[in-house]
Amino acid sequence: MREYKVVVLGSGGVGKSALTVQFVTGTFIEKYDPTIEDFYRKEIEVDSSPSVLEILDTAGTEQFASMRDLYIKNGQGFILVYSLVNQQSFQDIKPMRDQIVRVKRYEKVPLILVGNKVDLEPEREVMSSEGRALAQEWGCPFMETSAKSKSMVDELFAEIVRQMNYSSLPEKQDQCCTTCVVQ
């Protein structure tokens, strides 16, 4: 059984813990309690292949931002979460993705951009088109979720497994002869 380390990143109050706990336990956390760091494990079957996810739910507040490099260094897949009802949280996600690329030294890191709190549609500040455009720029999937109504939560974690599976496939080598002569 394959094991994957997934890191959930985003600003404070965007619903990182709510999404993670909803996925792992099937319950919604009503009360906001800022996270420093929480760790979860869950078995998941994606495309008939069993896997174990080790999910690191990180602090969203800036006072713990210095810990992010370590989380990123150890992570294999990343879920970047912003709140659909908070434009600033959408802006905050961009430097986090830049940090992932800097630490990993690789552009094609398994990553999903997530707009959370779709259940609060009347209060929306970030349009779906903005999320889609940013995901397209980054070359990653985009999803809108609701931890409260459990909308797209299981699909989100299944998709990050697919992304990690896809990135671990060996890249096709160029067709070339095995001997080269330089004169």
From Swiss-Prot:
GO molecular function annotation: G protein activity; GDP binding; GTP binding; GTPase activity; transcription coactivator activity
Location of the motif Effector region: 32-40
Annotated localization: Cytoplasm; Recycling endosome membrane
Proregion span(s): 181-183
Alphabetically ordered keywords of this record: Cytoplasm, Endosome, GTP-binding, Hydrolase, Lipoprotein, Membrane, Methylation, Nucleotide-binding, Palmitate, Prenylation
Modified residues (Cysteine methyl ester): 180
UniProt PTM comment: Palmitoylated. Palmitoylation is required for association with recycling endosome membranes and activation of TNIK.
Binding site for GTP: 10-17, 57-61, 116-119
Any one GO BP annotation for this protein: regulation of protein tyrosine kinase activity
Lipid attachment site numbers (S-palmitoyl cysteine): 176-177
Lipidation (S-geranylgeranyl cysteine): 180
EC code: 3.6.5.2
Catalytic activity: GTP + H2O = GDP + phosphate + H(+)
Membrane topology: Lipid-anchor
PANTHER family: RAS, DI-RAS, AND RHEB FAMILY MEMBERS OF SMALL GTPASE SUPERFAMILY (PTHR24070)
Function text: Small GTP-binding protein which cycles between a GDP-bound inactive and a GTP-bound active form. May play a role in cytoskeletal rearrangements and regulate cell spreading through activation of the effector TNIK. May play a role in SRE-mediated gene transcription.
UniProt name for this protein: Ras-related protein Rap-2c
Source organism per UniProt: Homo sapiens (Human)
Record gene name: RAP2C
